[in-house]
Amino acid sequence: MPQPIGSTLDRIHAAARDEFLAKGYQAASLRNIVKTAGVTTGAFYGYYDSKEALFAALVDEPYRRVLETYRTAVFGFEALRPEEQVTQMGQVGKTCMQELLVYMDARRPVFRLILQGAEGTPYAGLIDELVAMEVAATERYCEVLRSLGSAVPQIDPRLEHMLVTGMMNAYCEVILHDMPLADAQRYVEELGDFYTAGWLKIMGQ
């Protein structure tokens, strides 16, 4: 009986996910992946020309989806009138993170690969990219506050980077720990409240 179309590729992907999750990209063995998938090396190279290409096939779309969702939220917030930005500060970010949580929760193994197993690939910097976007957005928001007459102190860039990095790592920890989605959603809401209050204090609001 002929195999369903795509079954070989499905086996390669399943074996690759297990191998990358267990060992990370750098230590993962392409030979083990091929063996576990029950395919020949020639069959593998009919789909991918390298281990890196295989890893990219597993994570590229989700990786880019997260960045685009976050970027869209930032641009949407900045499209608001300055006065609206003040009233919506914190809420837009929490809404975005809840959306990302649902998306990432449905793909936990993939995001464990991205967050814990991607060293040595172009996909190892998800948190760094999110931090860069958030730091730039925070600085622009401070300028909005100043344009409205608020006396916002200059924030030390080192402190700003540490705070944003801590925030992004905290959000990602929710994905890395196995917990019911409802619990994760509550934690994300509470994290949002915590960091919003902290930023308001630092910004003198």
For each of these PLM feature ranges, what is it?
Residues 99-106, 119-147, 158-165:
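Amphipathic alpha-helical packing segments from all-alpha helical-bundle domains
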Residues 5, 30, 60-67, 71-74:
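Short, basic, alpha-helical segments at the C-terminal edge of helix-turn-helix-like DNA-binding modules
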Residues 51, 58, 62, 66, ...:
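Hydrophobic/aromatic residues within well-ordered alpha-helical segments
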Residues 11, 15, 19-53, 57:
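Helix-turn-helix
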Residues 15-22, 65, 69-76, 110, ...:
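Solvent-exposed, amphipathic alpha-helical segments
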Residues 57, 71-103:
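Hydrophobic alpha-helical connector segments
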